[in-house]
Amino acid sequence: MRYAQAVVRTSKASRYLKALCNHFDRKVTATYDDNRGWVQFGFGECRMDADDTQLVFGIRAEDDEHFARVMYVVKDHLERFSGDEGLQVDWVEYPFLDIQPLTNIP
C-alpha cells in the first residue's frame, strides 16, 4: 500500500471539496459534507478535509500504477476546477497515513 498527502491553501476549500466529490460521485462512490469527503475509486481512495484556510488530501492505493493514477486524477481535477485561482497539488509520500472512510455522513 502506498500513501500520500497534499495540503492546498485556499479560502474556498469547502467549495472545492463539495465540487470534487459531487463530480466524482457521478462515476464512483463519494461521500461528503461541507468539511469532509471520501472518494472510493476502483483503483484507490481519497480522503479530503476542508477548513477556512486549506484543503487536505490523503490518498492510498495498492500499487505504483494505481497510486500514480489517484494522484493524477485528484491533482488534475482540482487544478482544473480552481481555474484562475491556480491551485497546485504537491504530494508528499508517507510510509503510512491513517486514512479512514467517513462513517457518520448520511
Labelled PLM ranges:
Residues 26-44:
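Ser/Thr-rich, low-complexity intrinsically disordered terminal regions
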Residues 46-61:
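Beta-strand/loop substructures that line and gate deep hydrophobic ligand-binding cavities in soluble
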Residues 3, 34-38, 52-56:
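A generic structural signal for beta-strand entry/edge sites
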Residues 8-10, 59-62:
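Short beta-strand-to-loop capping motifs
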Residues 61-102:
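C-terminal structural segments of small proteins and small subunits
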Residues 1-13:
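Terminal, regulation- and interaction-focused segments at domain boundaries
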